[in-house]
């Protein structure tokens, strides 16, 4: 009987080949470094960056338009308020007297055309923030007759035995003489005349000029 044979020995696999060492990184050129930097990123983003700039410009333009619109509305409101104030009475006028009034000294005068009684003339002056004219000198009387020849009512009236101006001042007989026996006074070129208050004639209003 033959002895048992030993199985043949297995061949060992060859050891793995050694991996080559990684190559050293190649240095970047200046162009590549610039392309990888922030400016390169902006250039690569392209239209996105330009779109952001356009959006900011549009926003600034809209803001400017809104601001100009608000200024225009404010100016219009100021003009409306000034027009309303001017219609109620002159506050700061370019001329010292209203339209159709005449300036003499520091007063404005209005000479009516239609005849009315003394009280109606007084009421008209009152509604225009004035009074029937108070005459304080002969020169003032002469001025009045440069613009009227119709012997108008003035703001002088008898109260009891004495005459008083409508502004409350007493009448000075040394300045003017008064003829007639009536209560209300009108003027002639050289004197004052009293007559019945219901007599109709034109009148003269006066008030202080605007300053």
From Swiss-Prot:
C-type lectin domain location: 104-206
Keywords, alphabetical: Disulfide bond, Lectin, Membrane, Phosphoprotein, Transmembrane, Transmembrane helix
CDD domains documented for this protein: CLECT_NK_receptors_like (cd03593)
Coiled-coil regions listed: none
Subcellular location: Membrane
Disulfide bond sites: 97-108, 125-205, 184-197
Membrane topology annotation: Single-pass membrane protein
One GO CC term, this protein: membrane
Single GO MF annotation: carbohydrate binding
InterPro entries: C-type_lectin-like, C-type_lectin-like/link_sf, CTDL_fold, NKR-like_CTLD
Biased composition (Pro residues): 10-28
Disordered: region residues: 1-53
Segments traversing the membrane: 66-86
Pfam name, any one: Lectin_C
Phosphoserine, modified sites: 29
Listed PANTHER family: C-TYPE LECTIN DOMAIN FAMILY 2 MEMBER L
Stated name of the protein: C-type lectin domain family 2 member L
